[in-house]
Amino acid sequence: MRHAWLPYFDAVNAIIFLAPISCFDERLTEDPSVNRLEDTLLLWKAIVGSKLLGKITLIVFLNKCDLLKRKLQSGIMVNKYMISFGSRENEVGSVVKYLKDKFKDILRADASEPRTTYLYATSVTDTKATATTLNIVRDGIIREHLKHAEFV
C-alpha cells in the first residue's frame, strides 16, 4: 500500500524522514509481528530504492533520542530486539552510530542513484538543538537550490 503514494512526490525537492529510534523495542499496532524500528528501515529502503525519488535530497532525523536514553538507562537492551546490534555498548552514542551506519548502508545498497543525504540525531524536546539542526537543514536545501540553478 505504501508504494501507492510514491507518484505524488515527483515534484518534491527534499524529503524529511523522521525515524523514531526509541521504538526499537515496540511493535506495530496494526501488525504486532513487526518491530517498529524494522518497519522504519523498510520504509527507508522503499524511499531510497524508488526511481521516482532518485534525485531528491534526503534529510533523516533519528528522532526521540531523549526517549532512547531513558529506555537504555532503565536497562532495556537493544540487542534483545535487534540481533544485528550485537555486543555494542548499550548507550545512546553507540545506538545512534549503529543506526546512522544502517541508514547509510541501505542508501548505498538500494539507492537508484547517488544523492545528497543528511543524517541528524535529534530530540524534539531539546528545542535549542532542534532549531540549530533545522537551520542547518534549511541552509543545505538553499545551497542545493542555488547549485541546481547554477548560482554556486
PLM features per residue range, with description:
Residues 9-10:
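A short, aliphatic-rich alpha-helical micro-motif
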Residues 14, 18-152:
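Conserved GTP-binding G-domain of TRAFAC-class P-loop NTPases and closely related GTPase folds
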